[in-house]
């Protein structure tokens, strides 16, 4: 999936989970600041966003559907079963929040959250040691690529962890796939957001927010048909149907001249901008 890496904030135990959700959300027409992600679970920014704890609460608030890996339903070691689960979601173009140990740290469950965005595989159901996983590690501006056989390790990080900074736990695994937007109308079209900068001004460190330039693309249009692109600056006001009657912030009405339409938008970095595009009148 064409999901560009983004840089996490490091304060308050790190914003890796927030950054991973930010990246996945852009693929579904949603910009959300790392600050807002954490504010959904704790307004004072003290509680981390964690997979298998509160990540789904944030995704649900953003009107995104999700599914977590059922770690309690598999015997240990789980890595191969987990990897097959990740592959199945990536095949369906669903980004996956994956968790990892970090060499030198000590949490018994995991230390870091990253976003898996693609896979090169011989099949899309089971583990194969030669598969290649594409993921954004929330530190590098480049997509990481690792062969499956190099991805996992135990807490001591003495095997694959001796060479790589991040390894998926071998024994117990945690993950959360982002399935798409909540849309009961079944009429909303795919919307993607691309940002011109891979970093977000770190308001936690005292940096002032800025205006981001965003390219908003709508796909699956029918030439000659009329559409409405709704923008919501408050995630609490995003509906799952009846968009025309909703409390949107702005709307662009347009007639499709091709199967894809692109618009340039300005977004305040520490805020929210969520887009829904539907046939006019929906």
What does each of the following model-derived ranges do?
Residues 226-230:
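Beta-strand signatures of extracellular beta-sandwich domains
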Residues 220-225:
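Short proline/glycine-enriched turn/loop motifs at strand-loop junctions of beta-rich domains
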Residues 210-216:
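Structural beta-strand segments of beta-rich domains
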Residues 1, 35-190:
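Conserved active-site-adjacent core of cysteine acyl-enzyme catalytic domains
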Residues 257-282:
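C-terminal beta-strand-rich structural cap/linker in extracellular carbohydrate-active enzymes
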Residues 1-46:
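Active-site nucleophile-adjacent alpha helix/oxyanion-hole segment immediately C-terminal to the catalytic cysteine
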